[in-house]
Amino acid sequence: DYIAFITSEGEVAVYQGTDPSDATKWSLVGVFKIARPIGKRCIVNVGPELIVITESGFVPLTQMYAENESNYSKAISDKISGSILTAVTNFKSTFGWEALIYPKGQFGLFNVPNGVSGEFVQFVVNLSTGAWGRFTGQDAYCWGLLNGDLYFGGNTKVYKADNGLSDAGVQIQGNAKTAFVYYGGRGTSKRFTAIRPIVSSDADLPVSIGFDVDFNDGTSTYTPSSATTTGSEWDNTAWDSGLWAGTISSQLVWRSVADIGWNAAIRIKTSSQAQSIKWHSVDIYYEKGVGL
């Protein structure tokens, strides 16, 4: 058995054994340093690993023991380091930092303050793929599990999370964006002409699509509606505001785009209440440029 003692300054002492009163059954494994931990609920077990919320991100303790505190790329939050470091800079002294593993949902949840008056967001990592997402609208001071179900404590109330198809009776807003991908390689620019997100739903739902190039954000604007629709063909409505009819089968509609760039990302935005929706994949048409 191992036990780790972590100080507020990030000093870690690891011991091995079963009886601290017996020198033959208790020994020091090592002492090392990590970035300073944040909050009193900064540690979570993920299998045999310990993840610690620190000023440099969410770091695995065993890997940091093998490396050193300056190797920030070892943090499991490396892909979202910008968002985490911004939160650390602004709210590291604010109550509410916490980590929790939710086996039923197959994700790890990191509760992060987003203000000084009870505002919070949750950064969520898929335990199977390592992909990150963010939950908003759940201002949780603390999280816990009861009989495998997920709960959080809000302002004077306890809520059951990950339950039902609405957000306390109102619509659930969803906004997803892919990573920027250098389609066809990094060496040339491309002219992007059409995209086809593969989306399925069990009801009519509004789905709006955006398209960004060269690390820009929000190059198209859209406002989803909660109204149902019979659908719209790609050549009869604006590509970034058309409503898709949701069925139990996937939607396979091409949307025209007209952008030139080195890389691209696709955005999808929707809202739902009492319905479910899945984004499976995306197809894209582009032409590679020649030379500079």
Report the location of each language-model feature.
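Beta-propeller and closely related beta-sheet repeat lectin domains
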Residues: 2-3, 41
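Surface-exposed extracellular loop regions of Gram-negative outer-membrane beta-barrel proteins
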Residues: 4-32
